[in-house]
């Protein structure tokens, strides 16, 4: 695996059949500057963005997939070996880490949803700090991207959390790159541009806080539901593609709405319907408890059982709570 991976990295897009200097320049200008980025693209997107014919795009993508060894059947053992590349980011709470099988996985989308004040944004701030920590402290020693849709990022909170981890606050803030998204289309554009940042910095964590707020406010009523879901689907797949290509954690927050038809049990449902439900790899429901505590329930995972635990939000950040 290591030898093959090294060989893949040494290949350039000029090695692809049909990609000369002019085509390579178009592809690079459009953000397709390596084999893997092209291999996971769709022919339509590649053709539209780079200005090449769709037939040529299909040939280029097929060649890239062959070189990158993606899109083919693999044995379970081969997939298991590939999963050794997966890294896990600590949440700051051993309770929550254990619930997630060791922390947040790279190459996956982890969704935290809950009511206002349930701790979603606090966890995002903590993850941002933790990602900058050294590897020996269960961090990634990496930079972080945050797409802030509700103006909730607070550098003062980062400073508090960094000091609690014995990190230099100024250096920590320097490694966290924040972009304010003003509408859903701007949010989608920022996710697409994240790859440009990943080529300049080592990015192992991309946060979207919150995922659905703009979509929810801009697309109101059943008449606009189909368009909203289509855009949201594209956005989430862009995020997942980024996580796969750059071996990064994708952490998103989501809002909830009450179902008035539910008379027994919890009426709260996350926004986004099946699109978010099917695309998010891990889904965690946060609820308020007493004395700064929050109940975190894992409700969906490809391989972990459902379960819940207690975390505490303090001035120092996210810590364990008493069960």
Swiss-Prot record:
InterPro entries: AAA+_ATPase (IPR003593), DNA_recomb/repair_Rad51_C (IPR013632), DNA_recomb/repair_RadA (IPR011938), DNA_recomb/repair_RecA-like (IPR016467), DNA_repair_Rad51/TF_NusA_a-hlx (IPR010995), Hlx-hairpin-Hlx_DNA-bd_motif (IPR003583), P-loop_NTPase (IPR027417), RecA_ATP-bd (IPR020588). Coiled coil: none annotated. Keywords: ATP-binding, DNA damage, DNA recombination, DNA-binding, Nucleotide-binding. GO terms for molecular function: ATP binding; ATP hydrolysis activity; ATP-dependent DNA damage sensor activity; damaged DNA binding. It comes from the Archaea. GO terms for biological process: DNA recombination; DNA repair. Pfam families: HHH_5, Rad51. ATP binds at residues 114-121. The keyword Lipoprotein does not apply. SMART domains: AAA (SM00382), HhH1 (SM00278). CDD domains: archRadA. Belongs to the eukaryotic RecA-like protein family. NCBIfam families: PRK04301.1 (NF003301), recomb_radA (TIGR02236). Involved in DNA repair and in homologous recombination. Binds and assemble on single-stranded DNA to form a nucleoprotein filament. Hydrolyzes ATP in a ssDNA-dependent manner and promotes DNA strand exchange between homologous DNA molecules. This is DNA repair and recombination protein RadA. It comes from Picrophilus torridus (strain ATCC 700027 / DSM 9790 / JCM 10055 / NBRC 100828 / KAW 2/3). The gene is radA.
């Amino acid at each position: 695996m290591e030898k093959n991976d090294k060989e893949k990295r040494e290949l350039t897009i000029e090695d692809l059949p049909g990609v000369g200097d002019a085509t390579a320049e178009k592809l690079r200008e459009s953000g397709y500057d390596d084999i893997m980025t092209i291999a996971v693209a769709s022919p339509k997107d590649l053709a539209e963005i780079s200005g090449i014919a769709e037939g040529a795009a299909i040939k280029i993508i097929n060649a890239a997939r062959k070189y990158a060894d993606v899109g083919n059947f693999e044995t379970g053992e081969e997939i298991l070996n590939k999963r050794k590349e997966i890294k896990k980011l600590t949440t700051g709470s051993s309770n929550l880490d254990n619930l997630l099988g060791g922390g947040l996985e790279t190459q996956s989308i982890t969704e935290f949803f809950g009511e206002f004040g349930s701790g979603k944004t606090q966890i995002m701030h903590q993850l941002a700090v933790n990602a900058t920590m050294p590897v020996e402290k269960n961090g990634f020693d990496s930079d972080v991207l945050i797409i802030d849709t509700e103006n909730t990022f607070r550098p003062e909170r980062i400073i508090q959390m960094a000091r609690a981890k014995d990190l230099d606050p100024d250096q920590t803030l320097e490694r966290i790159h924040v972009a304010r998204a003003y509408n859903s289309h701007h949010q989608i554009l920022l996710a697409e541009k994240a790859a440009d940042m990943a080529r300049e910095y080592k990015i192992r964590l991309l946060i979207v806080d919150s995922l659905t707020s703009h979509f929810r406010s801009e697309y109101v009523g059943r008449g606009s539901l189909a368009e909203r879901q289509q855009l949201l689907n594209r956005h989430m797949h862009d995020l997942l593609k980024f996580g796969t290509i750059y071996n990064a954690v994708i952490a998103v927050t989501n809002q909830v709405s009450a179902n008035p038809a539910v008379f027994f049990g919890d009426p709260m449902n996350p926004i986004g319907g099946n699109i978010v439900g099917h695309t998010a790899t891990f889904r965690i429901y946060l609820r308020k408890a007493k004395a700064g505590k929050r109940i975190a329930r894992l409700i969906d995972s490809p391989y972990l059982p459902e379960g819940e635990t207690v975390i505490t939000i303090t001035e120092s950040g996210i810590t364990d709570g008493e069960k």
